[in-house]
């Protein structure tokens, strides 16, 4: 992980003395190989509430793991206690040390979510006060935010859709982009980890699902 990145190790595994160690198995393109399907079903997605990340007992509200490897964190806020996603963003910037292994860029969790019942924002790179969060919302009346949800919270799509096993594994396998922008000298190359916005993700997943169900057409 230190030599490459968390996303690279999750996707490609690593080798020890020429022995390949796979860290995750992703949905096979074809259902004709039952062994690949068995491997895919063996993936373990877990959620840890109040996950401690240092010796002082500090914790993050939620830690999502894939086969024991951290892939996402989330800070949850409730307006009933006079807090919202902005307080979660402030918490990430001021109280989450970007040098900590869980929060370190490339080394720790792939994405960090600031969540309240109305909005979701996310970032892939914690840089203390310089951290930039982007909306991960559906949109509301052609504007920002999320539409009303008669069956629950406006942000319930995050755990009811995005974090569901098949979708979450698809995102980790195919939708997170590690970009390197060459610089001179190479030691100063700029790197970023791109996590899709909600509408980008929804559009591609819908197209992929339709193609799998109906074929590519003629």
What is each residue range found by the language model?
Residues 1-218:
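ATP-dependent helicase/translocase motor core
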């Amino acid at each position: 992980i230190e030599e490459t990145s968390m996303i690279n190790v999750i996707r490609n595994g690593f080798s020890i003395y020429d022995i390949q160690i796979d860290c995750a198995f992703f949905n096979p393109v074809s259902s004709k190989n039952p062994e690949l399907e068995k491997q895919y079903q063996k993936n373990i997605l877990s959620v840890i509430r109040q996950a401690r990340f240092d010796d002082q007992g500090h914790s993050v509200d939620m830690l999502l793991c894939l086969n024991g490897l951290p892939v996402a964190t989330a800070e949850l806020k409730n307006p009933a206690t006079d807090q919202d996603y902005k307080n979660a963003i402030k918490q990430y910037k001021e109280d989450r040390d970007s040098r900590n292994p869980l929060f370190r860029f490339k080394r720790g969790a792939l994405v960090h979510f600031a969540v309240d019942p109305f909005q979701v924002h996310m970032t892939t790179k914690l840089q203390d006060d310089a951290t930039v969060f982007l909306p991960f919302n559906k949109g509301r009346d052609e504007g920002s935010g999320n539409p009303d949800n008669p069956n629950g919270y406006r942000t319930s799509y995050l755990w009811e859709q995005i974090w569901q096993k098949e979708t979450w594994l698809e995102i980790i396998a195919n939708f997170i982009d590690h970009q390197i922008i060459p610089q001179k000298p190479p030691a100063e190359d700029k790197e970023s980890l791109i996590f899709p916005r909600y509408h980008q993700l929804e559009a591609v997943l819908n197209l992929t699902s339709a193609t799998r169900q109906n074929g590519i057409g003629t």
